[in-house]
Every structure is written in structure tokens, then in C-alpha cells.
């Protein structure tokens, strides 16, 4: 509790943008996020009984708070401000990923991608791990700048279910309720309960996109590359579903 974490992310934003200029023309948009290796602001992985409260996060290199393969985590009263001294790419707010029994409350997020987001792994690796995101409550929260007050996906392979979100406000957020995935992801989204969601100046209140961002979501090795001579994590991404 109490304090500020400055991720000093600009150096990583600049690195990512530089790599995009190199990778995109080669048909490698799908792997650049992984090759860039941008750090998260806070990563809670394989943990139980964790509380994060009353802190301020800003300028992360990548996602601000990532809860991964964890359970019994409470996030209470945090502020995320990712638009100080620039706007970093894909600087999500809170990402709850293949985790369960999570409570997020009394938090305020301004970011440059999804504000409050649920994920469950992607593609063949997500199907292999097969860990759902479930039993999550998000309440009494505000989203300002960002791409999704409440988002499911695009990583949906393990499934997302038994989610409750209420007393949430989007103020100038690009999207309100956003569900996104692709045919490569798989997984089922079900039993999502949303109540008392207020949107002020939100461009699109409700969006469902099941062919989200094909250049990023579809992993394909361009001509001229030999699968025997690429990094191991490329092979994992290239494994067909």
C-alpha cells in the first residue's frame, strides 16, 4: 500500500515502435510484441492470497498490472495513469489472466489499451495450458482514457466464465463493453454478469469482434525464413491449433 511505481516505460515504447517499423513490412507483426520483451509494471504469477492496494502506477513498459495463473488476489484502491509524459502502446490497465477468485475494486485507470481486461491464454499454448479465467468480481471502478472499460480477450483459449462486474463508469473510454477473439484462439466466454455500467462520452458502448486484428493474431512464417533457424518461442507461436 501507498506509494508510486514509475515504470519509466518510454525507452521500451521507443524500442517497440522501432521494431514495428522493421518487423511489420516483413510480415512479422505477430511476433514483435514477444521479441521486444517489454516489462510489465507489476506481475503477479503463480501466487495465492495477495493484496495490492492504495498505490499509483504509471509509465509501464507494457501492461500495468498482470495477474497470471493466480488465485485469491485482491486489488483495491489503485490508480493507473499511463498518459503522463507520452502515451505508450498496449499499456493495458489491469489484466486478469487464467486466474480465479479475484476481486478488483475502487480503482481508477487511464491507459492506452484495455482498462479492465480478462484473458485466458492464446492459441495452441493456451489450449495446452487450459486454465480458465473465472470467479472474478470487478466493482466500483472508473475508466478514463483507454480502449475498453470492461474487456474479455483477445486471449480466450482457456475460457472465461463466472464474471461479475458492477458499478463501473467509463468516461471518454473508446469502447465500453468489449469482447474480442479470433478463430485461432478458441475457448468459451459464458456467465458474464454486468450491472449498473455507466458510460459518458464512450464512442462504442458494446463491441463484439471475433476476427480481431488478423495481422497480429495470425502467426505465419514469411517466405525466406526457415523454421529450423528461428527462436523457440516463434515455434510455439507457429504451432497450429
Q: Where do the model's predicted regions map?
A:
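Extracellular/periplasmic carbohydrate-active domains that bind, remodel
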Residues: 1-241
